[in-house]
Amino acid sequence: MRNRRIRILFTVIVFVFALLGLILPLSGNVNDISILRFFPNINLGLDIQGGVLLEYSFDVPEGVNTSEVVDNVITVLRRRMDNAGYTEAIVSEVVSGGESRVRVEIPGISDTQRAEELIGSKGKLYFAEVLEVVESTTTPEITRNRTIQINGEEIEMYSYVKDSNNPNLWYRVKNVFEFGDAPFQITGLDVTDAVASLNSQGAGFVVNLNFSNEGRQKFELATANLVNERIAIILDDEVIIAPVVRERISQGRAEISGIESMEEAQNIAVLIKSGNLPVDLVKYQERTLGPTLGRDIVTTIINAGIIGLIIVMIYMIIFYRWMGVIADIALIYNTFLLMGILSWTGAILTLPGIAGIILTFGTTVDGNIIIYERIKEELRIGRPPLTAVKFGFNKVFSTIFDANITTILAGLVLFFVTSGSIRGFAVTLIIGVLGAMFTNLVVSRLLLESTSHFLKPEKYVKGIVVEKGGTK
């Protein structure tokens, strides 16, 4: 009795957990495609709702671990997508022909310009002392230069950097500040936050920077020694702004002004907050996918799946009577469980993923048929309904378990060796089969044991009926 209560409680908790994943506002998605409109928390892939796919290649410096570079690139790009509001974007590694590339999939957008600006920019921010400004149609040459080592990195003391708005305007800058006890740099690592806003002092937009404690001390030291001189704020080897220092700045804040649009200001803020890319990215491919084709296909697939599901449910009731009703309840339970887990985990639902869901319907029904045929055999030899149910489940447990585990292993292989939409199929297959195994072995058993008195053993008994301890 105690075990049965535990199973009831566990079954209810799992169902409530899945249901909460479907009804709680976990995301801001608005799915308006067929029945998916009732599951707004499920993230849809590019092949369903359309979007942009961008893929980038890169060169790894000799002696540097490729895996570490890939992980760093993915981490930085993931932060950039989140900070830019593309929270549903997928950033992943793609390996082809022994070459690693990074793929970024952004559902629901059609304009690639901003995405390319965010992804393709290296995001390297630093401050430098301006020594002179020259005009030239080509890159000026540094006649005398030297390097200095800071934190194990060799840095050129001087360089020419072009203006972001005027390609013929060049700043000769000193990349290292030589004030205080030791030379130092002020980089994006010293910035804790960057916020885009309207310029309250004049036209245009600004990006407000907040420094860390160490960054504040560096910036205060630099500005104290450069009063009436210019400091350049450089992003991706372009001078964004080079203001004149009027006084020592000790508040730990700086401002990038002169930005023409809010979008540009937001992009700069995102790049600064997200950190530097360890390598330069080169665009390998770009695809823009419209949502119309995906929606039409999804609607067709879902409608076909619903029709097939109804036919299967009717079939189960006709051939298995009350056990068929239990099978249908288990099927609905598994559907909610699968959708709930997809919502909670944030997994991306793709067209192959929908095919995986439909496949799990068959897995759930197939498992129930195996169990019910075994129960019918137990009823035929005269076992009472409740005993027949218990014997039936006990005897097919290993069969159901082994069959589902085999399918799950195949799904795991697909998940780890593939990418994109095929991985989406693997995800829904694994979740669906796990749900099918749970509903077959726990939910269906609980319901059948609780309602075994609805079974009609006389429909299955043939010949001599065997009772406990003798014959009749």
Swiss-Prot record:
Keywords: Cell inner membrane, Cell membrane, Membrane, Protein transport, Translocation, Transmembrane, Transmembrane helix, Transport. Disulfide bonds: none annotated. Gene3D superfamilies: 3.30.1360.200, 3.30.70.3400, Multidrug efflux transporter AcrB transmembrane domain. It is found in: Cell inner membrane. One of its GO terms (biological process) is protein targeting. It is a multi-pass membrane protein. The keyword Zinc does not apply. InterPro entries: SecD, SecD/SecF_arch_bac, SecD/SecF_bac, SecD_1st, SecD_SecF_C, SecD_SecF_C_bact, SecDF_P1_head. Coiled coil: none annotated. The chain crosses the membrane at residues 8-28, 300-320, 325-347, 353-375, 396-416, 424-444. One of its GO terms (cellular component) is plasma membrane. GO terms for molecular function: protein-transporting ATPase activity. Belongs to the SecD/SecF family. SecD subfamily. Part of the Sec protein translocase complex. Interacts with the SecYEG preprotein conducting channel. SecDF uses the proton motive force (PMF) to complete protein translocation after the ATP-dependent function of SecA. PANTHER family: PROTEIN TRANSLOCASE SUBUNIT SECD, PROTEIN-EXPORT MEMBRANE PROTEIN SEC. Forms a complex with SecF. Part of the essential Sec protein translocation apparatus which comprises SecA, SecYEG and auxiliary proteins SecDF. Other proteins may also be involved. This is Protein translocase subunit SecD.
